[in-house]
């Protein structure tokens, strides 16, 4: 089962939320890979807010969503250099990371989608659907080594996000 990371960036702060809602309404079959989605928004002061694309009970237990939140935090936040080096060494494209971060300048938003080709879901169909909306589409493969690293990293990231939210 291969994994693909699809990120759609928008030059408007609330556009990612609007697009996600529209895609969910127009979705006619489970072929779209929308089970694991994270939404990132950047306000005028440059603060990035990350949240799951869905709010089901037990979202913290959804491994893929937690992985996406960690990865989005690494790409858009002020990450530790060793974490960036580890995921680049694991095979994540540094150019991809730089391009996504660059597109999130000013007030902006993004959808992070983890698309797993598993015989039911189709990453190509997901990309085609997202391309209907006026944003910038970025995609890369997500190697198993990066997923393994993020699995350990995600719990530390989620804990730090919860601490920041409660302050």
Residue ranges and their predicted role:
Residues 1-110, 115-167:
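Positively charged, small/polar-rich N-terminal and surface patches that mediate targeting and assembly
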């Amino acid at each position: 089962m291969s994994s693909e990371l699809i990120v759609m960036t928008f030059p408007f702060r609330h556009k990612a939320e609007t697009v996600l809602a529209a895609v969910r309404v127009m979705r006619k079959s489970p072929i779209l890979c929308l089970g694991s989605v994270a939404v990132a928004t950047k306000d005028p002061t440059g603060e990035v807010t990350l949240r799951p694309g869905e709010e089901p009970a037990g979202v913290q237990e959804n491994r893929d969503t937690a992985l996406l939140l960690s990865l989005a935090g690494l790409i858009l936040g002020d990450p530790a250099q060793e974490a960036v080096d580890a995921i680049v060494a694991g095979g994540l494209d540094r150019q991809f990371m730089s391009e996504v971060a660059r597109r999130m300048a000013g007030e902006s938003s993004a959808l992070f989608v983890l698309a797993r080709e598993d015989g039911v879901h189709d990453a190509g169909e997901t990309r085609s659907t997202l391309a209907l909306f006026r944003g910038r589409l970025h995609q890369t493969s997500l190697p198993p080594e990066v997923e393994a690293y993020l699995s350990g990293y995600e719990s530390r990231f989620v804990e730090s996000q919860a601490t920041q939210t409660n302050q």
